[in-house]
């Protein structure tokens, strides 16, 4: 059974462009980092992941992002998650309580020198082992996307497309390489409370 959910037109072109502008205008952007070392510290490792990142906290964001979250990001995630749960209804029965994680990342990968180059999963250390589901929304059309290795599946980066999948070791993934042009996305998680 395929546990990768793909939902198109979850955000409009205008909504995606507003989030991209928010990202580009932010003075809080930083180089993309990895935290898979188990300590939770941010490490810049361009051979693994190279690009730009903006971490946003649901509990502590500015008014502009708060409005984007309230008006369309969270409703879009709710809509997509509702569709995903139709395929996997057991998610609401027999599991411990779970909810959206406080933080998420807006990311940009620009050109063949940038991307997330290595296979990884989203729940691979004791620090993030409570993650159960990953959500990612592509903010623009790009000539690349995400590669899942088991099952083998490529998901093309398409503006407004939501992708949901299990966070664990069963779903290793990476960016499709080479990265051609600009690719913008938002990535976050649903975790056990």
What do these predicted regions represent?
Residues 1-134, 138-162, 170-193:
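Fe(II)/2-oxoglutarate oxygenase catalytic core
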């Amino acid at each position: 059974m395929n546990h990768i959910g793909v939902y198109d037109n979850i955000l409009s072109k205008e909504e995606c462009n507003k989030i991209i502008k928010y990202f580009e205008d932010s003075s809080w952007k930083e180089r993309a980092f990895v935290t898979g070392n188990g300590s939770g510290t941010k490490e810049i490792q361009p051979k693994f992941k190279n690009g730009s990142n903006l971490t946003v906290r649901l509990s502590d964001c500015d008014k502009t992002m708060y409005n984007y979250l309230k008006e369309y990001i969270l409703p879009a995630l709710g809509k997509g998650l509702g569709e995903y749960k139709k395929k996997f209804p057991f998610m609401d029965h027999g599991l411990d309580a779970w909810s959206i994680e406080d933080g998420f990342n807006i990311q940009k990968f620009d050109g063949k020198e940038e991307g997330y180059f290595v296979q990884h999963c989203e729940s691979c250390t004791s620090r993030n082992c409570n993650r159960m589901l990953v959500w990612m929304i592509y903010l623009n059309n790009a000539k690349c996307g995400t590669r899942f290795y088991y099952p083998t599946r490529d998901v093309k980066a398409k503006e407004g497309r939501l992708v949901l999948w299990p966070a664990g070791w069963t779903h290793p993934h990476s960016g499709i390489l080479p990265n051609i042009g600009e690719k913008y996305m938002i990535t976050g998680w649903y975790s056990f409370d």
